[in-house]
Amino acid sequence: MGTTTFSGPVVSNNGFTSTSIAFDDLPTASDSTGRIIFVNDALKASETAGNGTGNLVFSDGSNWIRVDTGANAGK
């Protein structure tokens, strides 16, 4: 995967596209610090275990964190 470094704000008039992956296929959080991924079966705040419909998560180097609540990601 290629990387690009920016020195200022990043602006898109057409949105951004994120990688999509299943929760069980996430790489280890410790190997992915700073990565942002859409997990297609991760839980949202209103969903129950096993019924996740997707959430954006990021790695803090220890855990995958849900962007909607700041809690550890789950499915």
Language model features with spans:
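Residue-level marker of intrinsically disordered, low-complexity segments enriched
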Residues: 1, 8-9, 19, 65
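Repetitive beta-strand solenoid architecture
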Residues: 5-6, 12, 32, 60
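Structural motif
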Residues: 1-2, 48
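Beta-propeller fold detector
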Residues: 66-70
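Extracellular/surface-exposed low-complexity repeats and stalk/linker segments enriched in Gly/Pro
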Residues: 11-49, 71-75
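Short beta-strand segments and strand-loop junctions that repeat across beta-rich extracellular domains
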Residues: 52-61
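Residue-level signal for well-ordered, solvent-exposed loop/turn and beta-edge residues enriched
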Residues: 35, 63-65
